[in-house]
Amino acid sequence: MREKLSLWAIFCLVVAFLPSQTESVAVMSVDLGSEWMKVAIVKPGVPMEIVLNKESRRKTPVAVCLKENERLFGDGALGVAVKNPKVVYRFLQSILGKTADNPQVAEYQKHFPEHQLQKDEKRGTVYFKFSEEMQYTPEELLGMILNYSRTLAQDFAEQPIKDAVITVPAYFNQAERRAVLQAAHIAGLKVLQLINDNTAVALNYGVFRRKDINSTAQNIMFYDMGSGSTTATIVTYQTVKTKESGTQPQLQIRGVGFDRTLGGFEMELRLRDHLAKLFNEQKKSKKDVRDNLRAMAKLLKEAQRLKTVLSANAEHTAQIEGLMDDIDFKAKVTRSEFEALCEDLFDRVPGPVKQALAAAEMSMDEIEQVILVGGATRVPKVQDVLLKSVGKEELSKNINADEAAAMGAVYQAAALSKAFKVKPFLVRDAAVFPIQVEFSRETEEEDGVKSLKHNKRILFQRMAPYPQRKVITFNRYIDDFVFYINYGDLSFLSEQDMKVFGSQNLTTVKLSGVGSSFKKHSDAESKGIKAHFNMDESGVLILDRVESVFETIVEEKEEESTLTKLGNTISSLFGGGSSEPSANVTEPVTDEEEVTPEAGKEQDQPEKQEETVQEKPETEEGKEAEPQAEEQKEDKEKAENQGETESEKTEKPEEKTTDEEKEADMKPKLQKKSKISADIAVELEVNDVLDPSAEDMEGSKKKLQDLTDRDLEKQEREKTLNSLEAFIFETQDKLYQDEYQAVVTEEEKEQISGRLSVASSWMDEEGYRAGTKLLKEKLSELKKLCKGMFFRVEERKKWPDRLAALDSMLNHSNIFLKSARLIPESDQIFTDVELKTLEKVINETITWKNETVAEQEKLSPTVKPVLLSKDIEAKLSLLDREVNYLLNKAKFAKPKPKDKAKDKNSTSESSKANSTDDAEKVIPPKTEDGAEKVKPAEEPPVVEEKAEETILELNPAENTDDKTESTESSKSENHIEDEL
């Protein structure tokens, strides 16, 4: 009984952990650019695919239009921007995580004077004020856009999606990254990771060229010029050995250079201003076109088109109908004029390359190729200047410049999701900005003079790999104190970049409870105050915890024999163990070196970092080689364990003599060092950009949910309005069709026609202002009125097919019944009851059909029919069930054995003839299907072998009926596997 219960418990446990069939398994990525976004998904059956928007385009403008009663996104929002630019918000990336006094906020206001930016007095950031009721922060607007991207992905995937990987520029600092995470939280998205867009591009490049990656390092530079910024990245590809998955390819970010404001949008603004100047010079209007916001929006749209055309043509004519005051504009612009307008921008093209080389401490001779990414790299002058600066023969264009980041990010999303299994590809991203810890400590000189000494400890050097955990130990504090988390040396940034960067001070950390922990453990030796830091996969620095660590010496119990240990372990499993909670003194003490300001790059100091506990071996940090210190520690432990094992082997189970016992008593007891840790209370004070409070976040989520509900209500109303309008017009037309006129009386026809006319008039006068509820009521009333007419028409349409099917079934059933009754009694497999039951069903069905059809023919077409399609289907189902029952019985019936005694006793010729006839009538036994398959000339079917490593194990199981196919077909038709 106990065994049965155990098996049942295991079965329930297994079922509990099986994935639900309705559970969402699709994941998405959003390549969030300054002007455009690309969305990609992974789902079962669709390995990696770019999502098409409602206009069937592969990229969508990052724009949202907020009118008083509706929202528009993407291309719809851009269409409104030409007519009413005040209600359209775009290029939000440049003001995320920025305070009101940041130069980029002023630059944004200059480019978009139609918007009214106000300072948030609580956080110091900005928000858009359209009216007293309509005020939105950049995070809220970005949250709307991210929610729209999820809507596109869900429509494309045909299932709900909540997990996403979002790209951000590599130069985003802590405040900017937190702002994107806040926007995603407002949108209700679960962010698996914020991945740098240059890293996503590098991952996409490596995934599709993994066969070309070997142990020899390959250095490749990606030059990405988008709409708003430019980034140059040096990436090293090579294979490395890992404990979890053997030798795997790896990419490592070695150097990053960037220019925050160099991009295609700045070129378009120069063209826009040039076109405005040309229009003013034509003097067709006394007004200055630059004072007209709508006209400037039209000029910007034309400048965007003009830039694209001039990339392929030497000259082109810009033209806009009704630019201002119904005046048309037309002017010719040459490529040379465009290049002259942007000359200073082209001079900045080599800048990011030089920064990346300096960060990586490499030269261009070590770079194998330079690959172009981003739409603005299509400008010929950009390519010419870049080619000269890198000194290569050519620039590579062997990846999709627009979609590479989205595809790399969605690969990472699949790797982070538990629903997919992907081929491992190790990613070592790098922190662009160094981070350090600063604190002050009172010191006493030899002459007794006390002074305050300011100390710095580097947490993450420039280009330090992450995700990574670090521990800093404060050894000389015995009371509460304060330390600061700040950015490190940013001298590599220009003066303008430093202004845009914002505050260099990240967080003030106030510790309390240090003194009380020392008093509590006064008899133990202090090992310092340890602060545990974690830079996660998104590049966001988190202070996990702070603890006060003490070391104490405890007497170790005498070594127990192996059998005693085993007995204690088994007894504890069955309730014999102690019920008291274990104390926090069980961890062995390990010396953690304090991070010093002289520390080199993180990859050169592996002993000073704490290994991150991994849950998924596919992620980057879990696949990296163990640090040197960890290996030394393992070797030491292994040696100790080996020594213990040898000592145990030498022990004998013989009883000790009295002298031995005395000698054992005289031996000193073993002593062991144990660690005691006490958590320290932490108070964090953010110094760069304050995060929204929990109350503000809930308010933002409610604000967006209200807008979403309003949009859904509007869509529902429009859908109901269209349905009502279509029903009126279609029904009015049907009243004049022959099949409908045949089933209605003149009185009924006039009633329906009159009600439809009244509803049509109401629609023209009041319907377009009516609410959804009233529209649904009107539609329901009309459908109820016409229900009888539609029912009669539908029934008459179904009769021919249904009756023909019934006649066919009756015919086949009769033939089957006659054949069954012709079977000799000695071979009969059906009972009389079974055959009589089938005969009864056939006769009753024939009688019902004849009587019902005859009754229906007497009725007028305008009354409710007695011959109903559902009744015919019920009769069909009953006949089919009875016949199938007998067919299945015949299929599995065993032939009766031959009567040998009767054949032996037969003496007359006639008897012999009869017995021979009987023998001929015996049905031979059916051979098993499996026996027919295995023939001498053919191999038996085998289980299919997978040619490659399985990727995405989420295809629906194949139909088991297909297993009866031949061996050749089973070998040729392998399972289709989604491969990333």
UniProtKB/Swiss-Prot annotation:
Domain of life: Eukaryota
Keywords, sorted A to Z: ATP-binding, Chaperone, Endoplasmic reticulum, Nucleotide-binding, Signal
Claim: NAD is one of the keywords in the record: no
Composition bias type Polar residues, residue spans: 907-916
GO BP term, pick one: negative regulation of hypoxia-induced intrinsic apoptotic signaling pathway
Keyword hit for Endoplasmic reticulum: yes
GO MF, any single term: ATP binding
Subcellular location: Endoplasmic reticulum lumen
SUPFAM superfamilies per record: Actin-like ATPase domain (SSF53067), Heat shock protein 70kD (HSP70), C-terminal subdomain (SSF100934)
Signal peptide: 1-24
Biased composition regions of type Basic and acidic residues, renumbered to the chain: 599-656, 896-906, 918-949, 960-980
Gene3D superfamilies registered for this protein in UniProt: 1.20.1270.10, 3.30.30.30, 3.30.420.40, Actin, Chain A, domain 4, Substrate Binding Domain Of DNAk, Chain A, domain 1
Location of the region described as Disordered in the Swiss-Prot/TrEMBL record: 558-682, 894-980
GO cellular component terms listed in the entry, alphabetical order: endoplasmic reticulum chaperone complex; endoplasmic reticulum lumen
Span(s) of short sequence motif Prevents secretion from ER: 977-980
Protein role: Has a pivotal role in cytoprotective cellular mechanisms triggered by oxygen deprivation. May play a role as a molecular chaperone and participate in protein folding.
Family: Belongs to the heat shock protein 70 family.
Protein name: Hypoxia up-regulated protein 1
Native source species: Danio rerio
Source lineage: Eukaryota, Metazoa, Chordata, Craniata, Vertebrata
Gene from which the chain derives: hyou1
